[in-house]
Structure formats: C-alpha cells, structure tokens
Amino acid sequence: MENNFIVNENEKRVLKQIFNNSNISRTQISKNLELNKATISNILNNLKHKSLVNEVGEGNSTKSGGRKPILLEINQKYGYYISMDLTYDSVELMYNYFDATILKQDSYELNDKNVSSILQILKSNINVSEKYDTLYGLLGISISIHGIVDDEQNIINLPFHKNEKRTFTDELKSFTNVPVVIENEANLSALYEKSLYINSNINNLITLSIHKGIGAGIIINKKLYRGSNGEAGEIGKTLVLESINNNDNKYYKIEDICSQDALIQKINNRLGVTLTFTELIQYYNEGNSIVAHEIKQFINKMTVLIHNLNTQFNPDAIYINCPLINELPNILNEIKEQFSCFSQGSPIQLHLTTNVKQATLLGGTLAIMQKTLNINNIQMNIK
C-alpha cells in the first residue's frame, strides 16, 4: 500500500465527514468537528495532496453574501475494492470504487465444492495489475461465507464447501498483496443495513438471512455483535420439535425444515417434480394448493422465529434477506400480521433488506473499506 494511504487521526475524522456527507464544505466540517477553519484547511490540503479527496465546485453563499463555500467529495478514482460472496453454487464478485460506487460485477459457477477450486477461480479472474482507471488500483478484498469466522479471521465452519485445510485470507493476501477481510454473510448484510443513511438513527437491528441456511446479523448499539467465537446469530441451529413424514416427533434444526432451500425441497418431494426457483413462484401465483400450503407453513414458522428473536434482543428493526420473500412480498405482509398478534410490547420495524441481491456484497465493501482506512461507521447511500 502506498504511503499516502496512511492518514492520522484528525485526517480520519475529516475523511469520515466527507464519506458520510456528500458534497460537504470545509466550514460545515469545521462546525461538525469543532475544529477551527485553519486546522481543517491544513488537513484538507494534506488529504488533497494524497489524492483522497477532490474539490467539486461551489455551494450556495449565505444570506449575508460573501464567498461561496468550496464543496468536497471522496476521490472515487483513488482505487477500488473487490468483495466476494461464496454462495452454495457460485462465486459472486463486486468491484467498487474508493467511494463504494459499484464498478462492475461478475459471477462464476462452481463445478465442485473444494476451496482449492474457488481459489483457482479467483486467481484466474482477478487481474491484480488492472487499475480500472484509478490511481492505485486494488486496495483490498472482502470475503463473505455462509459459515462461522472467529475473531482471528479463521474459518471455524464452512458447511457447504470442502475447506481442505486451505486459508482464503493467507492465500489471497499472498496473491494480491492487499489487505483481506473474511466475515459471515449475515453479519455483512447487517453492516450494510446499519451503514445506510436512512438507518442512521437506528442503534439496534437484526438482519435475518434465509437461503440454504438461516443466519442473523446482530447490531447492538451500532456495533456488530459476534459473540465469544464468532458464532452469534447461528439461529438456524435452533432446535424445534417436528414430525416429518408422519414419524414420531424429533428435534430438527430449524434451517433443515424451513430455510428457503428446505421449503423448495419439501415442495418438490410433495409434487414429485424438481421445480426451479422461477417455477416455484409461478406455481404459487397460479394457486397450486400444495405450494400454497407449504408456504403457509413457512410463514408460520418464520413468524415464530422472528418473534423469538425480538423477545431475545428487542431490536429497533429486523430486516429479512430472502429471495423468496423478495419475489413474493405478500409473504412479508402475512408474517407482519401474525407477528403483531404474538408481540405485546412496543412495535418494531419489520422490513425486507434494502437490497436483497447486493446487501452482502455491499456489506463486504464496507468492511474492507473500514479495515483499510481504520475508520468505523462509514455511511453509504447505495441502495
């Protein structure tokens, strides 16, 4: 990393103001940070010399007249980040400029579940020397996994892939020579939701990620809560008593009976066919009774799970990241109706994740931005 990427504490404070306030003036920065204008001017000169910020024209003058204020913004073309989401059957890549604006996205299918194959895909398709019309090129990489990561950035559990005793972070650092951060996908979705301007007044929130498994990203007092070993939010492992195929009641992990993939598998078993996700939506919209019944059972179980989450953490809001609910928003309406019957206390906000398709990747972008800059609570306005 170039030396001009290193900033001192006052420079970090000013840089954060510019990240979090689009087209802000030095006068407003001075007021926000309670630093005199001369100090702010010196800091901004340093940041401009390092190519981290740009002047973008003039704002409106005050009612009393005088010089129009110079407005500032983050230099988008300083460099770029790559965020990766390792899904069950693909590797999703998002490239973002220094200000988090999306540069491009790529998707690669997995032919097998071996980590060695995944690393080979990355090494074959990431051109480390490519700068994409930026000054310094690649600045850092984030990795999202559907699994558990401890506080030392070690993968504790990777249920859908074969780890082969390979380490993503070490091998990618060696290949790219940039910082790498790895995190659970639900946690990254929660970081993204917390970072949005529209949620800036929310202190406590949960994102509920429902895909092949079920996980929760937990924000408490504006900070990600990971637990003692990174296992907080593994609510898909919650045990429920269930009778399957008319057998005696047994305890099952809730994600084994009502994750999105478990729901689709159950419907396929009952219909005796193999529906794609798109076909499932079509069957539901056409009023297929079996599909409607199983989705109703899914709604019932999800409502109970959300109610239990609410009683345990009492967040300001819960955001649901689920492609099925994104395609069939009436499911969320029914969950809300049932939830209101269960919950006797103060109402909470219950929403779809702001960006179901990109929340995890954008959360990864935020995580690596904050790591490389050593600045917390950067806000973004990308929906």
From Swiss-Prot:
Cross-referenced InterPro entries = ATPase_NBD, ROK, ROK_cs, WH-like_DNA-bd_sf, WH_DNA-bd_sf
- Stored Gene3D superfamilies: 3.30.420.40, Winged helix-like DNA-binding domain superfamily/Winged helix DNA-binding domain (1.10.10.10)
Q: Which GO terms describe its molecular function?
A: DNA binding
The record's DNA-binding region positions are: 26-45
SUPFAM superfamilies attached here?
Actin-like ATPase domain, Winged helix' DNA-binding domain
Q: Which UniProt keywords apply?
A: Carbohydrate metabolism, DNA-binding, Repressor, Transcription, Transcription regulation, Xylose metabolism
Q: Which GO terms describe its biological process?
A: D-xylose metabolic process
Q: Which cysteines are joined by disulfide bonds?
A: none
* Protein function: Transcriptional repressor of xylose-utilizing enzymes.
- Family to which this protein belongs: Belongs to the ROK (NagC/XylR) family.
Please identify the protein, giving its name as recorded. Answer: Xylose repressor
UniProt source species: Staphylococcus xylosus
